[in-house]
Amino acid sequence: LVLEPGRALVDPAMQLVCTVVAVKNIPGKGRAIILDGGRNLLSPACRRTPRPLSMIDTGHVDQTAQPPSSYSPAAVFGPLCMPEDIISEATLLPPLAPGDLLLVQEAGAYTVTQSMPFVRPGAGVVLIGPDGPVLIRRRETDEDLFVRDLLPSYLERP
């Protein structure tokens, strides 16, 4: 493959919204932010190149109380118990708390088709159209994980 224009077109078109699950201060290393989404939702293209991150203003945090001078480097991790689940090793971010939302930008290429329902069901997909946001793929449920599985009759309980 010499040229892959699709990735250049699609990457900026999709963003991943993640919730901060935990914030830890690691002595000698700095802040570690753990999100509810990570490598299980991001495509391999996103795994090789760090994506820009930013906090989403949900209105419950006074953004004026967090000037850029309060930002500090943070390592950002996904929810997987794997050393590869690093979203960013050092991104300047404001003070964060569990429940805050982070936006992983430029996450479009192959993200939906190659995400894996590991640890939790897959995320929904929202299209931001001319009339506002529209759900175009609902979030998976626990039942969705098993809906295609078939149980042979000899394994069924009487």
Indicate where each model-derived feature is located.
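Charged (often Lys/Glu-rich) extended helix/loop segments that serve as interaction or gating elements
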Residues: 1-158
